[in-house]
C-alpha cells in the first residue's frame, strides 16, 4: 500500500448500506424520485429539502421501500400534531400507514410522535424515519440520546427537515450521530478548531465556546457531509425544472406598539439595548402588545396562529381572543397533540403557543 492509498483509507465518507429501490411510484416528481432512490441506496441518509418540496411523500416512499424489501415495519417519527397529518398523506397516495400511540407496530408504516418513542422497541423495525429532524437539537440531552440510541439499533434510517442550517455545525453533528456516522463531538474534534485558546478558562469567564472549520479541513468536511446528506432549496439544485415550485413572495408587515407606561424611576424611555433591558421591556409592554394582536385577530375572522414567548403573553391572549386555544409547556403531551390537531384540521380558529412547542410541522 502506498502513502496515497493509506491516506485515502482514512477519509471520512458515509458508506452505502442500502439497496436498489423496489417501488418507485408515478406520483413523485422527477427530483423527488432522484432523492428517494439515492436515499434508499444509501440506507442511512438525510434529506434536507426546503419547504414545499414534498418531504412527506418522499419519506413515505422511502419507508415503503424498506418495508417491502425487508417484510418488516418502519417507524415514522414526527413532532406533535404531525402524525395524523402524515397518515392522511399516506392514505392520499395509497400507502399503508397507521398512527400508533401505545407501541402497536402492526402496520406497514407506523407513525408516532417523538414523545411516544419509549413505547416502541427498535427490534420490531427494519427502518426509522425522523421527520422534522431539526427537532433533535431542541431536545434535552437525555431525550436526544434516547432517539439516537434507538436509531442505532435499526439498520435503515432517514432524516428529513427543511431547516437544517449549513452554518449550524452542532445540528449537522447530531444528524450524523443519529445516522451512525461521526458523533457530533468526534466531528468537531476532527474538522473544527475551538476559537478559545483555553476553553476551561473561557467557561469560567462565562464565554460561549465557538467552533470554526480548520482551514485545511473545509473541503473534506463538506465532502463528508455530502456523502450522507442532500441539501435542496429548489429542484434546479439537482438539475431539474423549478416551474412548479416557485413560491409566492412572503409578505412581512411590522406593527409598532406605543408603550403606555415608563420604566420604574425613569422620566422617559431609553432604547432597550442589552438583553436585560429587552426582557424588562417585553414584560412591561405585555398588555399593550397583546391588545394589538387580539384586535387584529378578532377583526379578521380568519384562522390565525399567534406566537408568544412569555406565559403572561399566552394567558393574556387567550383571555382576549374568545375562540382561541393555547398550548403551553405545562400541558400533557396528549393535550398538546389534541389542540395542535384541532387547529391543523380547522376545528380551532386560533392557536396560541410558543415556537419551541409548536413550530415543528405547523
Task: Please provide the spans of the model-predicted regions.
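Walker A/P-loop
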Residues: 42-62
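Conserved Walker A/P-loop ATP-binding site and its immediately adjacent core
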Residues: 56-61, 71-92, 166-171, 309-311
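Conserved P-loop NTPase motor "coupling/switch" region that bridges the ATPase
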Residues: 72-73, 127, 135, 144-236
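Conserved helix-turn-beta segment of the N-terminal RecA-like "Helicase ATP-binding" lobe
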Residues: 81-103, 179-183
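Conserved interdomain hinge at the start of the Helicase C-terminal
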Residues: 277-309, 316
Amino acid at each position: 500500500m502506498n502513502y496515497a492509498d493509506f491516506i485515502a483509507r482514512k477519509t471520512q465518507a458515509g458508506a452505502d448500506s442500502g439497496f436498489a429501490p423496489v417501488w418507485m411510484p408515478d406520483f413523485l416528481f422527477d427530483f423527488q424520485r432522484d432523492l428517494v432512490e439515492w436515499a434508499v441506496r444509501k440506507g442511512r441518509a438525510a434529506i434536507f429539502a426546503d419547504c414545499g418540496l414534498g418531504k412527506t411523500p418522499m419519506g413515505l416512499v422511502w419507508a415503503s421501500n424498506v418495508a417491502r424489501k425487508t417484510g418488516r415495519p418502519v417507524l415514522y417519527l414526527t413532532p406533535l400534531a404531525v402524525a395524523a397529518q402524515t397518515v392522511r398523506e399516506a392514505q392520499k397516495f395509497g400507502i399503508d400507514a397507521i398512527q400508533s400511540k401505545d407501541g402497536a407496530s402492526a402496520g406497514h408504516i407506523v407513525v408516532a410522535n417523538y414523545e411516544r418513542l419509549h413505547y416502541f422497541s427498535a427490534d420490531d423495525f427494519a427502518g426509522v424515519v425522523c421527520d422534522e429532524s431539526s427537532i433533535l437539537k431542541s431536545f434535552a440531552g437525555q431525550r436526544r440520546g434516547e432517539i439516537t440510541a434507538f436509531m442505532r439499533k435499526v439498520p435503515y434510517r432517514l432524516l428529513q427537515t427543511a431547516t437544517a442550517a449549513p452554518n449550524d455545525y452542532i445540528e449537522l453533528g447530531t444528524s450524523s450521530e443519529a445516522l451512525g456516522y461521526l458523533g457530533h463531538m468526534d466531528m468537531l474534534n476532527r474538522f473544527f478548531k475551538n476559537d478559545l485558546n483555553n476553553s476551561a478558562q473561557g467557561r469560567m469567564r462565562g464565554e460561549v465556546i465557538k467552533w470554526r472549520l480548520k482551514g485545511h479541513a473545509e473541503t473534506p468536511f463538506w465532502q463528508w457531509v455530502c456523502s450522507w446528506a442532500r441539501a435542496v432549496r429548489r429542484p434546479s439544485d439537482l438539475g431539474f425544472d423549478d416551474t412548479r415550485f416557485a413560491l409566492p413572495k412572503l409578505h412581512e408587515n411590522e406593527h409598532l406598539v406605543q408603550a403606555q407606561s415608563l420604566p420604574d424611576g425613569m422620566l422617559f424611555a431609553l432604547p432597550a439595548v442589552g438583553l436585560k433591558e429587552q426582557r424588562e421591556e417585553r414584560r412591561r409592554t405585555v398588555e399593550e402588545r397583546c391588545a394589538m394582536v387580539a384586535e387584529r385577530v378578532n377583526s379578521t375572522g380568519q384562522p390565525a396562529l399567534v406566537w408568544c414567548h412569555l406565559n403572561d403573553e399566552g394567558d393574556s391572549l387567550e383571555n382576549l381572543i374568545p375562540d382561541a386555544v393555547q398550548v403551553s409547556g405545562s400541558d400533557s403531551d396528549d393535550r398538546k397533540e389534541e389542540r395542535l390537531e384541532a387547529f391543523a384540521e380547522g376545528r380551532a380558529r386560533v392557536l396560541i403557543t410558543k415556537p419551541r412547542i409548536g413550530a415543528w410541522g405547523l
